[in-house]
Amino acid sequence: MKKGLLIISCIAATTLLVGCRGGRGRGSSTSGDTPSNTVTPGTSNSGNTGSKPTGQSSNTSITPEEKGSTTVLIYMCGSDLESGGDYGIEYGGLATSDIQEMVTVIGQPSDVNIVIETGGASQWESTFNISSSKLGRYHIRSNALVKDEEITYASMGLASTLKDFLVWGMTKYPADKTALIFWNHGNGMQGCCFDEKKNDDHLLNSEIQTALSGAFNELGRTDKLEWIGYDCCLMQIQDIAETNSAFANYMIASQESESGYGWDYDTWVDDLYAGKTTEQVLTAIVDGFIQDNGGANLESYEYQGETYAADQTLSWLDLSKANQYMVAWENMANQLKSKITSSNKSSWNTLVDSAKHFAGDDYAQVGIFDAKDFVNKLAANSTFNPGSTYTNAVLSAHSALVKYNVAQKGAGNAFGLSLFYDIEGQAGRDDCYTDDDTNFTNWKYIVDNYGGFSGGWW
């Protein structure tokens, strides 16, 4: 377990603090190579030829392990969180640290597997001898990281790379329940898993959906994943939750920028090994993360003579309620379309801007606002209020969708789910909020037609 209050202030988007999971990273860097042996070398059954330029292995030749009860797939894009970026490896090692946490947990049942794909970092700490020039595939067994295979490097920001890992992982380690974790930076609708070896190429929500759909189709899979998690900043967004609901039962993510150390892996892995329910494991992730950052009652903290808000958040959702929520939101948005005009859109943007926002001073570049706080303010606004029938329906659906949410006192009105709105035209809506990225079509119409443009709201 990580000890002490972590450095949890973060600048998302254009400026990145090493040790923070928000933003795009520091840009590309050249890769170095490290030895390929791990703590416990394993034998690959994948039939990988090592010659495919996409990095994909020959998944048709995988020899599956015996079907287990649970497999957790971790897509670990190390980036500068691992390499330290411009500051060097001594300021990185955060991916390695989380692997170390997992391998120290005792009592792993034989039918529970944690499977990791590594990449995305120009350098890895030497603890596990993870190569930066290959994509590595590992599993945890007997308190050791065991190598399954290394394959030709490909950007972790490609849908094809994610899809290949999903196909390989679900084929090699079949289970009654399968979970998927994205480990890296997150930047809201602008995506996650920024590969510093490939000019910060990253996964948009549309690309994640393409990868999931492709993997499910290739495998003929009809059972949903048990849960999808984002150990990344700023990813608990209603559009992402709704699209993920086609592929998973639950989702866990943060509305705010996460502290650099991210989740407390040993705490929740211990509960996983103990056979706790999905709901208990997800709750343990939330509680462990918040506790590691000083607890829910913390309002602020001091660091190097400066005072910062303690604003960490984490929540998990019941995705079976996501469609109901989207319908309620879209009905509300449809009413709003007749209330917002070119003459009052400045007032409209002021209303949206008054809602709780995330990513600190750079919030306009990310465009993430608390959904419930916005609806509460909308309901109190005489100009734009669509009527209590619509706002109450959204609030009721929100309560059903957000099953567990903890926010530190310094986070303010963070109720567990965010919306996207391009308040100043800086959040990249033309690239990250397309018809392929969201099914909230009425809300997208409002964002596209009444959101701000570069330089202001007019």
What are these regions (language model features)?
Residues 44-60, 167, 171, 188-189, ...:
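Terminal, contiguous helix-loop blocks that mediate binding/assembly
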Residues 176-191:
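Short acidic, glycine-rich surface-loop motifs adjacent to enzyme active sites
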Residues 1-4:
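Positively charged n-region of N-terminal signal peptides that target proteins for export
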